[in-house]
């Protein structure tokens, strides 16, 4: 993990010189990665226990190992990490998250419910009233990140077993979240999807939409920007969803998809402009 962190920070520095307009975001990401590793190292409790006897049934039944809709978890440590993340943002932009930090101190921010709601796309944002949209986006990002150290522990312990089990769904087999980015790698050009919620990567069909399961080649497409062919946006014209894809096979680089997700935000904007979600 220490080497991965070191490599990620080097990549961030490289991208800051190539794409200076993302400099501030990349700086924040660097701080988050350092803090993530710190919290992961000091986390002693098992926050997301896995019933190993049910693992095989869950995987073959298309169910993620962790069920956030019905599970009850002690989220004390993730909540501490969430508060620390808000403090990073407040330090960089005073006043940005002050209101949310005050809500936490006053007991008016139900962190546990917000986490549960983040796994249910039908739920509305409880904090939306009177708070700037940019701050809500930041809070959503930090809610997701706050679980990452604890979920990485699950990935470390069970990731290899899950990878061997042949998961075929487009959502994460560990936590159930949908991917935002993936990569093409190995000589055979295999496709892997990446979960920004827990950090797990799993193999997935090249010609298939991870969101609706569409396999009709004529309704699946991709586009890229001239000069940035190592990045592309895969789109599905059935469900109008998209996913970013990284292909570093020519350059032989190793992709850190946490960093690449930030470094390719312009592709998200482009996909949205083209009518994809």
Where are these regions (language model features)?
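Cys/His-clustered metal-coordination modules, chiefly Zn-binding fingers
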Residues: 153-271
């Amino acid at each position: 993990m220490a080497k991965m962190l070191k490599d990620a920070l080097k990549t961030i520095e490289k991208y800051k010189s190539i794409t200076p307009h993302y400099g501030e975001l990349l700086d924040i990401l660097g701080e988050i990665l350092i803090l993530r590793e710190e919290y992961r190292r000091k986390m002693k409790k098992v926050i997301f226990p896995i019933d190993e006897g049910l693992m095989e049934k869950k995987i073959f039944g298309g169910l993620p190992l962790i069920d956030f809709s019905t599970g009850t978890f002690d989220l004390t440590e993730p909540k501490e990490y969430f508060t620390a993340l808000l403090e990073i943002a407040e330090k960089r932009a005073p006043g940005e998250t002050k209101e949310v930090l005050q809500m936490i101190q006053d007991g008016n921010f139900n962190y546990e419910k917000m986490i549960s709601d983040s796994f249910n796309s039908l739920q509305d944002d409880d904090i939306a009233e009177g708070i700037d949209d940019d701050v809500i986006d930041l809070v959503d990002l930090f809610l997701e990140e706050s679980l990452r150290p604890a979920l990485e522990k699950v990935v470390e312990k069970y990731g290899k077993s899950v990878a061997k089990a042949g998961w075929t769904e487009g959502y994460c087999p560990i936590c159930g979240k949908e991917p935002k980015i993936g990569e093409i790698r190995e000589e055979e050009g295999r496709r892997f999807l990446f979960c920004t919620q827990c950090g797990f990567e799993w193999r997935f069909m090249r010609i298939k939409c991870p969101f609706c399961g569409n396999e009709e080649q004529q309704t699946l497409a991709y586009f890229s920007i001239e000069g940035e062919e190592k990045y592309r946006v895969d789109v599905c014209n059935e469900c109008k969803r998209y996913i970013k894809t990284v292909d570093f096979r020519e350059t032989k680089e190793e992709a850190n998809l946490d960093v690449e997700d930030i470094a390719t935000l312009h592709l998200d904007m482009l996909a949205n402009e083209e009518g994809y979600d």
